[in-house]
Amino acid sequence: MSLQAIQFQRGDKSQVSVRVLDQLLLPYVSRYIPIQTVDDGFAVIRSMQVRGAPAIAIVGVLSVLVECQLLCNEDFVAVQAFYDLSSYAAFGRTMRMRLAHLLGSRPTAVNLSHALRDVERLLDSATSLSQFRDRMYDYACELLDMDVANNVRMGDNGARFLLDALIAEGFDGSFAVLTICNTGSLATAGYGTALGAIRSLWQHAEAGLTAPKKQKASACAPRMTHVFPLETRPYNQGSRLTAYELLHDAIPATLITDSSVAYRIQTSPVPIKAAFVGADRIARNGDTANKIGTLQLALVCRHFGIRFFVVAPRSTVDGTTAAGTDIPVEERCPDEFRVVTGAAAGATGDPTTASVAIAPRDMPVWNPAFDVTPHAYIDAIVTETRVFTKDAAGNFDLDELFT
């Protein structure tokens, strides 16, 4: 059974339901949170109960849809004093304020901004609340279905690109890859972005296939046999979520600390040939904002001559942002650094969460959620349409994504 970060029951467009997996409780407890309003969507995004740029956008859109559904219910209208439903224009004014509120939940991930821009266009084109609700339903369904399909295409594109490159340079045998944060089914509608590429590599290895031709591989054909996910402090998305997904899919993997990556590359019994990372926003020149620690990983990979790939959908590329210096970088609460939360060790019965302080309460903390990797350290950007590489001058040309 595949992992589901978002459960969207869509049989009847007037009676949809949305639940999101509380990822702060993983990997020990699987508990879903119902989403009924925009405020619910804001809360789970802001608290990082749901995370990953594609999933954030999807949950944001679904929270608008379910709020519209409730507004169509007269029992609910009576308690929603902040909406004026005397006219569609009055409703639209309030909805725009709600969308602006939702956008403030996570400012770095551009997918949410792009999705809410689409919602505003639907709001402008509709003439009634019920029509807007129906169009939101169609858009939400399309967004989820396209995300999964695009993720599979991205995964295959990334896997084929790496295997082709290894074959071209004459490499044969087993190899390993690195990844950071969580970019799999838990960060998307399904399959994943960077972790999707790793899934595709593992499928090639299991099937004994080379890329791009689906023929039986020789015993020495390149094949990925191991993954090294970084723990990804301070929220530990690598140790809590990516490790959980790799175990779920039975992909051979060994969890490593963020600080041990250079030594792991240096001593790995299986050569590490690539790092696959996701993105929360890609600037027009290819500079990439991703989970804090990504820049450090890129620098280490450059030192050791390891290919560094960014895997992200077209919606993550921001044509209005020229370079990484223009990307707003979210800073999180200092206590998210000072305190670690997890399952209580040695507890019997159902796992219980416990929080442990790991730094003095009055110690100043700098806790950025993201860093920005300059395009100079990125070998390729993998999208659902194709893989982008740099020209002879070392620059990406992403212009076709904006036409």
Curated annotation (Swiss-Prot):
Cross-referenced HAMAP family: Salvage_MtnA (MF_01678)
Job description of the protein: Catalyzes the interconversion of methylthioribose-1-phosphate (MTR-1-P) into methylthioribulose-1-phosphate (MTRu-1-P).
GO cellular component, one term: cytoplasm
Organism phylogeny: Eukaryota, Fungi, Dikarya, Ascomycota, Saccharomycotina
Pfam families: IF-2B
Protein's cellular compartments: Cytoplasm; Nucleus
The protein's name in its UniProt record: Methylthioribose-1-phosphate isomerase
Record site: Transition state stabilizer: 181
GO BP: L-methionine salvage from methylthioadenosine
SUPFAM superfamilies according to UniProt: NagB/RpiA/CoA transferase-like
NCBIfam families from the UniProt entry: eIF-2B_rel, PRK05720.1, salvage_mtnA
Major location (coarse): cytoplasm
